[in-house]
Amino acid sequence: MTSMKNLYLFSILCLVFFCSCTPKLYDAQRELEYIKADSTLCAEYEVEGERLAELYAENEDSLYIKAVELEAYADRKNKELAIEYSDTPSGLKRCFMLRLDIEKDTLQSILSNLPRDLRKSQWADAIKAHIVTEQIEVGMKFVPIDVVDADGNKIAWDEYRNRNILLIYGGLGCMGRSGRSELATLREEYAEDNLAIVVYYPVSTLEELKEYRDQYSADYIYMSELMPDYSPFKIKYGAQSTPTCFVIDKNGTVVLKTVGVDVQQVKVKIVR
């Protein structure tokens, strides 16, 4: 009886210790503060961009330099704000979106200091997965992901052995008409048994995937995991910005990884 009583008291003490050492629920006011600060940063970026465009309207080189500086400043402030407000839902979500620009040690520290109600959120789980996963980089072997095509058929990656693969993470719309035209020319230039062009879209339903296929060229293979934003593909391949481009050679080695699709860069990596 005494041992049971001691065990009961020990359990209570452990619970009290846990509650006293665990951060409280997230502060709704800080969530509002972050949303306001983020909106302010975005507005300032747009205003300054317009000001620079007018100021350097006749000097494209200077405009480009200033635009790069402005973007770097905005990116830095964006990351700083996300880390500062990582104890809020929106801040934590932004940390996941910026995970490739934040050291994994910093991300681990963020997770360790989360309020209790955010520790088991989808964004916390996604960041955990990112931390423990080695992201695909140039020189590494291609890792197949379970995906389906726009008709709902599971992609059989073995069918693409001994082919070059151009894998594009979303963003055909972001490429613009000229970019899509260059991609179409690339498709015409190489036989399908030499080059497979695969476009991954982070959608939840087949209907959405079919819409992209219908909107753009049916000459490409459209695929998706039909999962939320923190899918295994995004985690393993370190894909966030659209489009992100991967070229996998005939030996299954990733030989190119870039944000944006530079068709000339792609062609250099394709082995006929």
Question: What positions do the PLM features span?
Answer:
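Preference for long, solvent-exposed alpha-helical segments and helix-linker "stalks"
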Residues: T22-S109, N113-Q122
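Loop/turn elements at helix/coil->beta-strand transitions in domains of secreted/extracellular proteins
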Residues: R161-I165, A191-A196, S217-Y220, K250
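Bacterial Sec-dependent N-terminal signal peptides
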Residues: M1-Q29
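Short acidic, S/G/P-rich loop/turn micro-motifs used as interaction or catalytic elements
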Residues: L172-M175, S204, D262
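N-terminal "domain-start" segment that seeds a small globular fold
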Residues: E71-A72, W123-W157
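Short active-site neighborhood of thiol/selenol oxidoreductases, capturing the structured segment around
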Residues: I155-L183, A196
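Thiol/disulfide oxidoreductase modules built on the thioredoxin-like
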Residues: A218, M227-V271
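Structural microenvironment flanking redox-active thiols in thiol-disulfide oxidoreductases
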Residues: S178-Y216, P228-K234
